[in-house]
């Protein structure tokens, strides 16, 4: 029986993903425990287990939720719908992102890869686009204009900022690249894809 488990890079801590795990919150600890259980069950032959470490997915459709990363979709999704959105971290905050399409592509590849392609380690980091929250806001302005981008409220929240900055912004995804997986080109392309997949979202035309 094969099981593909989704996890995250949050348990790695703020250092590069090639370092030993240093989770800085309960979420990271729980993800790390889950990975080890899958690895142990695979070692014993109970399952054919694969841990896929997802990057923060943006832009997600739907409504805001209670996750610390929720604003990384909300600060784009809500303004495009004409709604205000809070951004609780400074513009220079670095983040590692992946579009929904790239994330799904990675999960499918993980499920279909042969044992020889996958290798002995059960866990793999999916590729990430490294960007900053400020660059995300700038991409929104390029896509939809200043009026839409002005719907972002820069409202600092130290608790959220402490969590987000404990996540790695630089990810070692060499194994994923060997499987043919690549990160998104830039955040402009992520917004363009979101608009294409959500035709009800119609931002004003911008000449900028």
Descriptions of predicted regions:
Residues 72-86, 94-123:
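Alpha-helical substrate-binding/gating segment
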Residues 2, 156, 168-178, 185-208:
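Amphipathic terminal alpha-helices
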Residues 35-61:
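Conserved beta-loop-beta element that borders a ligand/cofactor-binding pocket
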Residues 2-17:
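N-terminal Rossmann NAD(P)H-binding glycine-rich loop of SDR-like oxidoreductase domains
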Residues 24, 55-69, 89-101:
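Glycine-rich "substrate-gating" loop/helix at the edge of Rossmann-like oxidoreductase active sites
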């Amino acid at each position: 029986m094969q099981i593909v488990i989704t996890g995250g890079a949050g348990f790695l801590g703020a250092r590069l993903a090639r370092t030993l795990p240093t989770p800085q919150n309960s979420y990271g600890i729980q993800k790390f425990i889950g990975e080890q259980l899958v690895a142990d069950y695979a070692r014993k032959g109970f399952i054919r287990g694969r841990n896929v470490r997802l990057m923060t997915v943006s832009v997600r459709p739907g409504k805001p939720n209670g996750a610390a990363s929720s604003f990384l979709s909300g600060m784009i999704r809500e303004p495009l719908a004409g709604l205000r959105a809070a951004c609780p971290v400074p513009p220079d905050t670095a983040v590692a992102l992946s579009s929904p399409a790239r994330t799904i592509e990675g999960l499918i590849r993980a499920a279909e890869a042969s044992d020889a392609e996958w290798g002995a380690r059960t866990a793999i980091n999916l590729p990430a686009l490294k960007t900053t929250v400020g660059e995300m806001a700038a991409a929104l302005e390029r896509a939809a204009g200043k009026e839409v981008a002005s719907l972002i409220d820069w409202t600092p929240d130290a608790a959220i900022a402490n969590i987000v900055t404990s996540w790695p912004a630089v990810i070692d995804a060499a194994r994923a690249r060997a499987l043919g997986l690549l990160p998104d080109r830039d955040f402009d392309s992520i917004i363009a894809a979101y608009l294409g997949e959500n035709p009800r979202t119609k931002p004003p035309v911008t000449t900028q």
